[in-house]
Amino acid sequence: MKMLDFKVKRFVGIIFHLILAQICLAQTGIANQNFGKDTLQLREVVVRATRPLAKLNSEGFVTEVKGTVLEKLGFAKDVMGMLPGVLNNNGSIEVFGKGKPVFYINGHIVRNNIEVEQLKANQIDKITVITNPSSRYASTIGSIIKITTIKKVGDGFSFDNIATFGCRNYMYGKDNLDLNYRIDNLDVFGTLGFEKGKNTNSSKNVQNSWLSSHHQQNTTMKSTQHSKLIDGKWGFDFSSSPKLSFGAFYQVSYAPIKTNSSIMSSLYSDDVIESETSAYKDIKLRDLEHLLDGYCHGVWGKWNLEMTFDLMWKKTRENQNVIEQTGINQDFGIKDVGHARLMATELYASHPFLKGNFSFGVDFTNSSREENSESENSIMAGENNKIQELNLAYYVETMQHLGNVTFRIGGRYEHVNSEYFIGGRKNHEQSHVYDKFFPTASLSLLIGKTMVQLSYSKQCYRPLYSQLSNTVHYVNKYLYQSGNPYLQPSYSDNISLNLRYRWLALTANYKKVQNQIITSYTYYDDSKTIALLKKENSRNSLSNLQIMASFMPGFLWKCYYPVLACGVVSQFYKIDYRGNIKHVDNPLVVVKFNNIFKFHNNYMATVNYSWRSAGNSENIKMGSVGQINLSLAKDLSKKWNVKLSANDIFNTARKNTFTIFSGMNDVYIEKAASVRAVECIVRYKFNTVKTKYKGKGAGKKEMDRL
């Protein structure tokens, strides 16, 4: 670890030395013989960058990337961290107040994040952030990020490879190869991906129960994880004419993960120790997934027609062996096998209408998930359960332009038939039929130099299939985890306000949620010594207000581009805790301060800071966390690009803390996992062309649930 600290500090010093050297060169005018040309190019970029890069339209915030400093930033996820209302948390993209978005690239839905990770900034034309999706999208989708790439032409073979090497406690690496062959109107494409890594983490749990006496269970755990990912994708796209195109692809991925853990537990009753236990746990997890996606897009007169379909199969196998030592050794094993499948299709049509358009469509999804668990020498019983769902949705909407005013109004009707089987027999108490109408409406208007968008939507959150399973998972001697087949969907009413004025972007959202799904802490059996974590529907409604302001002044001093965003999430919620009403309404404050430095000789440096305060989310108290990341990138040629980065240089994001309050119990969880890492990314491309695949995909949210 000391050697890693030394390497990180040395790497940070090198980056700052290069930044300082480039600033000195820029200020003194000592560069190369082409300095005048570089200055002219830089001056042109400055002129374009001083214009607002983000504008607001009827969908959401649209940010121009082509021809701006953002196209030199590196990769798509680096660009997203600079967008208003978007957070980049160590590669995990979130829309503020909306959670993880659904990605679209050139109209087709992204099902593998490798595609987003491979996308380079200079391939992007624009990015649209939608915080209140229209009726066309499933009621469970809270936000969308749509990426439009620069249209490229040219036939022949293209090759694009990205290799990543890094150190985070241990060395890790991944490689992604993108191949494409284009001839006339036919595209044949394929991707291959491989990842391998090793990491360590630790956790500490303190469980408190206030019954006739005070019980406390203390648990510490250290784990080492080995992971791999092998991914392949092959497909084609054919455009017989400008009015007709179709295509399909097949994708397969295999992800084996092995985790070894050592656990120390102790039980206290009124501060008097009753027992101590040590345990060793080995988990082997293997995921195999197959996906077939296809689309057809056509124009018939003034009608725009689209059809998409998806077929997915997934198998998960988990073997868990535990050795507990409590004076005598107890060895037991748990085997869990899961099978999931999905069939989804969407039909969509739109037509010009009055001063806008009119559109309608139908979504159909049929999915199932079956889980079989076997327990050997354990008090946890084996389970066999199956969930089968049929989802049929109809939607219609219209968008009209009236001078400086644009309004969109629509509705979506969803019919869901959910059937729950235990041991092959249908359980009617846990089977449900839902029929619900979800309206959406938005109004956009220009007031002077200010663009304002006000929208309303009704949304739904359906439990993940794993949250509905009654299978019990072993965490440690005093803590188990399971799903809850009695969970109901939660529904929310959302009012959103987006505002854009010159260099200021403001996003605000208020929502009220009924049947909020929260984490509960109960007991596994009548002995009340083993806690059980599971999800349940809250009896109290939850209201939530989110506001974020982003300041983007453009270029300063011709080489510096800052983006400062400050946001607050405040919930209004109360729970029953230890016989009293507890208000969990401490706000969460989020700050991001991203900085781009552009220099001569194709150098680009970034210094990014992010921080989240302590506060409440649902019935959980979250601790504060923050980090600083540095990077330096250079285009060596038109084919080669190198990027060096140091993440979490002060190791401040290593620890995350949570406290869950539930009934007469609470549990404090402290997780420590290394985020700090040094990384080198090397990219080589040859005759790159972007695939013309236009499939939008169907049933994305249902796949996430599976």
Residues covered by each model-derived region:
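Short, acidic, small-residue-rich periplasmic hinge/interaction motif at the N-terminus
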Residues: T28-V69, N89-N90, K98, I130-T131
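N-terminal periplasmic accessory domains that precede
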Residues: E44, A76-V79, N113-I114, V129, ...
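Extracytoplasmic beta-strand/coil segments of soluble accessory domains associated
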Residues: A54, K77-I109
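Short acidic/polar hinge/loop motifs at secondary-structure boundaries
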Residues: M82, H108-S134
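Transmembrane beta-strands of outer-membrane beta-barrel pores
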Residues: A163-N169, I183, F194-K198, V252-P256, ...
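Face-selective signature of the C-terminal outer-membrane beta-barrel domain
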Residues: L229-I257, Y280-G423, L446, T450-M451, ...
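Outer membrane beta-barrel strand-and-loop segments of large Gram-negative receptors
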Residues: L342-E346, A393, Q488, A505-A565, ...
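Outer-membrane beta-barrel signature, preferentially recognizing the C-terminal barrel domain
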Residues: K386-E389, E429-H432, C460-Q514, L532-L545, ...
